[in-house]
């Protein structure tokens, strides 16, 4: 044995042990039990926490408002809005179960809940994001059907079919997101305080295709077809409406009672005018579908802008390490996708007055009491109200045509003057309603008018509890003239176009024999 070698080995052992000991505590490949926590920057933690906390709170409140708006307003319960509610549910689930823990990770700089919960968090993240974009894919298909087949839409897209489509969305989202929980992921890091999205190359490619690129292709194809169909159909229908308006010769106002609404429709058919089969009705329904498509097109556009950078960076960084972005850039891209969850509750009220009014009623705690006022407004510009007293009555219309269109979707504006006939709400028709009474109006009737009948003494400004009647606009004169005056049976109509405001005021005493 060489003593020098033995001596050298023995003298170097303590030094080697010291180096090994230091490496265990400070080396880069440290274990979870020996790792040290990163130093917390209090100022940065507070500022980031406040910003992300406000963002998460806004996303939660906004998506709850969207859900309650549809739940508390019967006229918003349409198949299209069911898809919107499903999108809000996905964003709400993301805001409750994913974003708080993502914000904690950003504030503290490390994961505090262990490896198992990290895997669950990542899977729920993929689930919610996939459900969101698949909901947008279903919305785009729904909008194409609504624009392409606007008259047949209620029979093609029923509530049952919409619910089945929503269930399919969540089933597909679960299939795409469950892979990492079943072991389809990269090996877990040694440090349990590290947590992030799965970057296993093939799963990253699979999830990007299933969660984003394939639905995105469907969305773009559907909205391109919507644009083509909308442009062609609008041109054809507007041309038909102008031709129909030129052939119209009269403006008829009728009072409908509860029991004789169908008789009123038959009287209009006898004059050769069928509101339900007119081109104007088709244009109105098509315009409503096209407006909804525009609103949801904005939603889809913002979703693409928010999530496209992430779904570009994730597969490229997983497949090619040289193309992986810096951590700071990846965090910004990551949270940009999350930011989409609070955008939709902003887009809906800005693009739809129905959602805006629903939001205001809910914020004012008027979810239930607002229903009755909404029904009154639905009569609005195209349905006037009359409550009889002894032998007189009060007939008043002060709702603009535009507001009535936004509330009920049953009136038209612009060139859409021929209105679909719709029964008044049964809740506003008293018992013992009288037969319909035909009235007439000045031929130069314009939107934004105010009609009134004399009120009996002592009853001014008061509403009577008697039966409520409505009369609706069923036609339009070809040109001003005296034909209406000759057949009005004593009604005195005058125009009021002061200051360039279209409208008229008319005093029309009702015939006593009708009540």
Swiss-Prot record:
Q: What is its main location?
A: nucleus
GO annotations under biological process?
Answer: adenylate cyclase-activating adrenergic receptor signaling pathway; cell-cell signaling; phospholipase C-activating G protein-coupled receptor signaling pathway; positive regulation of cytosolic calcium ion concentration; positive regulation of MAPK cascade; regulation of cardiac muscle contraction; regulation of vasoconstriction
Task: Using the record, list the residue span of the signal peptide; answer none if the entry has no such feature.
Answer: none
Detail the disulphide connectivity of this chain as listed in its UniProt entry: 118-195
**GO MF terms held by the record:** alpha1-adrenergic receptor activity; protein heterodimerization activity
Q: Which residues are glycosylated?
A: 10, 24, 34
Q: Where is this motif: Nuclear localization signal?
A: 368-378
The record's InterPro entries line, in alphabetical order, gives: ADR_fam, ADRA1B_rcpt, GPCR_Rhodpsn, GPCR_Rhodpsn_7TM
Its keywords, alphabetically, are:
Cell membrane, Cytoplasm, Disulfide bond, G-protein coupled receptor, Glycoprotein, Lipoprotein, Membrane, Nucleus, Palmitate, Phosphoprotein, Receptor, Transducer, Transmembrane, Transmembrane helix
Membrane-protein topology: Multi-pass membrane protein
Per the record, what ranges lie on the membrane's Cytoplasmic side? Answer: 71-83, 142-161, 225-295, 352-515
Question: Where is region (Disordered) located?
Answer: 392-428, 473-515
PROSITE patterns registered for this protein in UniProt: G_PROTEIN_RECEP_F1_1 (PS00237), G_PROTEIN_RECEP_F1_2 (PS50262)
What is the annotated localization of this protein?
Answer: Nucleus membrane; Cell membrane; Cytoplasm; Membrane, Caveola
- What Gene Ontology cellular component terms go with this record? caveola; cytoplasm; nuclear membrane; nucleus; plasma membrane
Residue ranges spanning the membrane: these are: 46-70, 84-105, 116-141, 162-184, 202-224, 296-319, 327-351
Where do Polar residues bias regions lie?
A: 410-424
Q: Which residues lie on this side of the membrane: Extracellular?
A: 1-45, 106-115, 185-201, 320-326
Q: Note the lipidated residues of kind S-palmitoyl cysteine.
A: 365
Q: Does the keyword tRNA-binding apply?
A: no
Function description: This alpha-adrenergic receptor mediates its action by association with G proteins that activate a phosphatidylinositol-calcium second messenger system. Its effect is mediated by G(q) and G(11) proteins. Nuclear ADRA1A-ADRA1B heterooligomers regulate phenylephrine (PE)-stimulated ERK signaling in cardiac myocytes.
| Subunit structure, interactors included | Homo- and heterooligomer. Heterooligomerizes with ADRA1B homooligomers in cardiac myocytes. Interacts with CAVIN4.
Q: What is this protein called?
A: Alpha-1B adrenergic receptor
Q: Which organism is it from?
A: Mesocricetus auratus
Instruction: Report which gene this protein is encoded by.
Output: ADRA1B
